[in-house]
């Protein structure tokens, strides 16, 4: 294995009890203090700076709007809160009741992963929850105990991934939904990223997904159905200075999953990329973990101070006070997505993700139009 030192995390206590009533703080999971050098979690999106990515203006311009969004009194722009799924999606409904699904979730102890686990269990599905070094005490209602398995899994190891897949099939004879929200990132300018850190990010974020797909796809293909739900990031929409290799892994994920979606459509398979905005963390976690715990922050050299390369570091610190996307709502949406007959290839959750994608597409179209006349023919005019 590469030089990728990951001290064992402190034991976690995972509570998958049903959701608290609306308006009450969700009592979901309490994680003991102590952190790894890297944490396998659902990757966070990062919005843009005023100089390089105009999206930040929208959030700094109206403190009152932010307050309404954070308190839930106003549906978040761009989210599906208060809106129905498009009819073409054929989401679960009274006329299209959901069938029980078997979930295989990688990154199940991250903020996003465990909320999805809970959403699936609350609605009658069964879950194999996998995470690296998952030394946990799982507290679940008695009626859920026969619908939840847990397993330690480092996605860089193809063998460990295969063992999780085999256990799932042995227990429930099938896999309906494969979900991956494992990702690591290192914050530093491209020039100053260590080779072993870059390799670690690609081994986890790209090769880990490759292992997951290759070991699960035969079972999905055999049944002519199934779906992949893969968490991307705003860093998969645009390159973020200070997160070059991490953005690279997310762009690789983009191409891989989109290609996969075309390949598996022939036998009824579906694949969806998820782009979350800045995720609200668990209330208990906020008290014991820094908002940047998702990334390893490297010291910045004098050469890169006060340059765009410092953007990612500033944004991670900024996120601590500007998280607007409800992770509980994400769990509910992902469950509905998994039970929809015609899911989209891309699903953006939160106004930051939506506006960042719009801005990226706008800039790309403008650039194409500005430069398209430079070369207009396919043959050499001599």
What is the predicted function of each stretch?
Residues 233:
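Residue(s) in the substrate-gating loop at a strand-loop-helix junction
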Residues 123-138:
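Conserved glycine-rich Rossmann-like NAD(P)H-binding loop of the short-chain dehydrogenase/reductase
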Residues 189-190, 194-199:
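Substrate-binding pocket helix/loop in short-chain dehydrogenase/reductase
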Residues 213, 249:
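Active-site helix of classical SDR
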Residues 109-110:
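Conserved glycine-rich cofactor-binding loop
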Residues 266-343:
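SDR active-site lid
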Residues 144-159:
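Rossmann-fold cofactor-recognition segment
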């Amino acid at each position: 294995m590469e030089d990728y030192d990951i001290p064992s995390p402190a034991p976690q206590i995972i509570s998958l009890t049903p959701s608290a009533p609306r308006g009450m703080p969700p009592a979901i999971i309490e994680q003991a203090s102590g952190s790894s050098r890297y944490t396998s979690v659902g990757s966070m999106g990062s919005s843009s700076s005023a100089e390089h990515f105009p999206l930040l203006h929208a959030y700094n311009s109206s403190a009152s709007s932010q307050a309404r969004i954070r308190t839930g009194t106003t549906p978040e722009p761009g989210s599906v809160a208060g809106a129905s799924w498009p009819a073409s999606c054929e989401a679960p409904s009274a006329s299209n009741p959901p069938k029980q699904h078997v979930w295989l979730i990688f990154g199940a102890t991250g903020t996003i992963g465990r909320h999805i686990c809970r959403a699936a269990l609350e609605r009658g599905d069964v879950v194999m929850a996998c995470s690296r070094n998952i030394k946990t005490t799982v507290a679940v209602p008695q009626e859920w105990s026969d619908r939840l398995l847990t397993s330690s899994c480092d996605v860089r190891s193809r063998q460990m991934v295969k063992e999780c897949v085999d256990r799932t099939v042995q227990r429930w004879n099938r896999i309906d939904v494969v979900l991956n929200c494992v990702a690591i990132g290192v914050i530093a300018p491209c020039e100053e990223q260590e080779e072993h850190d870059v390799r670690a990010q690609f081994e986890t974020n790209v090769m880990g997904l490759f292992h997951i797909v290759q070991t699960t796809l035969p079972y999905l293909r055999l049944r002519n159905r199934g779906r992949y739900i893969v968490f991307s990031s705003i860093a998969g929409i645009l390159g973020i200075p200070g997160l070059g290799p991490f953005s690279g892994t997310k762009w690789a994920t983009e191409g891989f999953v989109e290609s996969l979606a075309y390949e598996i459509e022939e036998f009824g398979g579906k694949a969806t990329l998820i782009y979350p905005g800045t995720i609200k963390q668990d209330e208990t976690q906020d008290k014991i973990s820094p908002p940047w715990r998702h990334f390893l922050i490297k010291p910045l050299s004098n050469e890169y101070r006060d340059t765009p390369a410092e953007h990612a570091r500033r944004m991670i610190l900024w996120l601590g006070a500007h998280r607007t996307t409800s992770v509980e709502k994400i769990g509910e949406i992902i469950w509905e997505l998994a039970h929809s007959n015609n899911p989209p290839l891309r699903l953006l959750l939160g106004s930051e993700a939506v506006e960042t994608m719009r801005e990226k597409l706008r800039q790309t179209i403008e650039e194409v139009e500005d430069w398209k006349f430079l070369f207009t023919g396919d043959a050499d005019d001599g």
